[in-house]
Amino acid sequence: MSIDGYLARDDHRLDWLIGTEGEEDTRYEEFYASVDTLIMGRNTYEQVLKLSPDEFPYEDKTCYIVSRTLQDSHTGTHIVREDVLSFIKNLKNEKGQHIWIVGGGELLQALLKEKLVDELYLQIAPVMIGKGIPLFPPTEQESRFSLQQVNQYKQIAEMHFVLKEDH
């Protein structure tokens, strides 16, 4: 995300990330290997398809798309239309590795409100874009996390947080 908390420009473009020194050096492969399930909203899903039109980049994982309006999805993905919070609560109780919420916005906010997010991995690029799609939309919800680790990959900072149990 940008220093000022945005995932993308208003039109979902990520051009501001291009050329950020270190973006290719993060431990993404290690993180990705620790995940067996991905969940994303329709907007994130459509952006993934635009960025990778020839091959869906998450074919080796179980992938759920949260949308009430999406009619069709890529082979191997599953559309979740109703009662997303109950679906995710049940999913968290299944055996497996980590669940990755790809993107952010409204879906992430709803999950935070219900305390369904255990950890946050935030990567911050040294760019301010001024406006765009925020990772965390405004809310009345307060959540407390404990900082576990900070890594630097050239110009990218990564912070790992764990939700505090007592809050």
Kindly label every feature range from the protein language model.
Residues 1-167:
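Enzymes that bind and transform nitrogen-containing heteroaromatic metabolites
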